[in-house]
Amino acid sequence: MVTLACGRAPVPDGAYVTDWSRLALITVRSERLGPPVAARLSAYAGLALHEGYAADVRSGLGSLAPRLTGAPVMPAVPSEGTVDGAIVAAVAERVVLDSLLRDGFASTVRRVDSLAAAQVARRRTDGVGDDEVARSEAHGTALGAAILAWAATDGFFATRGREWTPPRRRDQWENTATLDQYVPQTLSGQSDFVSTTNPNVRLDTETASEKGLFTNRPKAAGPTTLPAFNPTRPTEPYWGELRPFVLPDADACAPPPPPAYDEALGSAFHAMGRAFYDSVRVLPDSLRQVALFWADNPVATGTPGFHWISVVTQMIPRRGLDAPAAAELYALTTMAIADAFIGTWREKYRSMVVRPVAYVQRVFDPAYRTVIPTPPFPEYPSGHSVQSGAAVEVLIGLLGDTLTYVDSSQVDVGQPARPFASFSAAREEVAWSRVYAGVHYLPAVLDGLTQGRCIGGQVLALARPRG
C-alpha cells in the first residue's frame, strides 16, 4: 500500500479488487449461472470497479465510457472535493450487483452488501475523512445507477421469455443432453451430487469438479433476470443479439463460415468429422485429463470465462498490482470475455453446426462416447477458444507473456493444479482440450482462437498507455 502526500489515505492494494472477483466466482457457482449470463454479469461488475477507481484523480485511469458501444452517460465527478476510488468502486459495485442479482438467493445479496460495507469501513480506518466518504458514496451510487441504465438497453431483457423452436433437421444442431444423463444422489440438504451415464466420466465425491456437482437449492428466479443453467434446454439462443461492450457489433470479428453439412465421402464436412474421430478414438489418459481440467461446466468451476477470471485473481497479488491497476485488468478481461460470448453465440446459432458426437455416431461409430457431456448449444465456433483467445490477449497486453504460473483455479473442486509456461501456452491447451473432450472439430477451435484474439485486441485498445 503506497502512502501519498496531501494527507490523503494510502492507495488501496489489489485485494480490494480480488475480494470482488472471488465473490463473483462464488456467486456464479451458487446461482448456477450459464456461461453467457455469467459473462454479462462480470463485465458490468468489472466496469463498475474500473469507473469507481477512475473517479479518483490518483488512479491514473480514465473513464472507459466514451469508448464503449452505445457510450453510457456517466455522472460527472464532484468538483467541490476529492473522492476516494475504493469507496466509489465499492458502492457502485453494490448498486450494480444488488440490481443484477435481485432475483438470486438472499445470501448472495447479503455477501455483496457486507463486502461493500467492509471496504468502506477499511477506507475510513485508512484515514478517509467523513466529507470525502460522503462524496464518494454519493458518486458511487450515481455511477452504479448510470451503469444499470446502460445495461437496461443492451438487449438482454428483450431476449427473456422468447420462444426458440429448434429446426429438427439432420443437417442442423440438436441438443443431445437429456435428463437421464444426470442422476441425483443427495449429499445434504444443500446440494446434490450429479453423476452421468457417460462411461468415460469417472465420478467420485472427492473429485466431482466439472464431472457434475450441481447445487440443488430452491431458486425462485425466473428467466427474466437471473436464469439458472439448464443443460437440457438450448442455452441462450438469442444471446448473439445483445449489444457488445466494446465491439461495434457481434460480427466485428466473425469467423469464416464452417463447411456445409455432408455425410458423403470426399466432402469437406466428412473429412472434418473423420479427422476428429481419428484424433480422439484412442485418447491417452494425459489428454483426457487436459479435457477434464478445462471442462469448466457451470457450477463446478464457474464457467469457462470464470476460469480466466480465477487466473486474473491469482495474477493480481503475484504482480503486486494496486487496486486501480487490478481494476483495469479485471474490467478489460471481463469485457473481452463478455464480447467473446456475444460474438460466439451470434455464429453458433447462425451456422447451427452438428456436434461431433451426433455426426460420429451417425457416420463412423454408433458406440462413440465423449469424455464430457456435450454442451447444450451449437458447435461452431468453440466458445472456450474464443473467450480464451480474448482473455489471454488482454492478459498478455497488460502483464506480458513471459510469466510462468500454476493454475490452481480448480483445486477446490478436485482438479490438481496445473503449471503453464505462459498465458499463450494455456490458451493453446484450452483450445485443444475441446477436441480431446469430444465436443469440437478442429476448425472450431482454430477459428475460435483467431476470433478471440481479434476481440481481445479491440478491448485491449481501451487500456491506458504503457510506458
Located regions from the model:
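Acidic/polar surface patches and capping/hinge elements
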Residues: 9-467
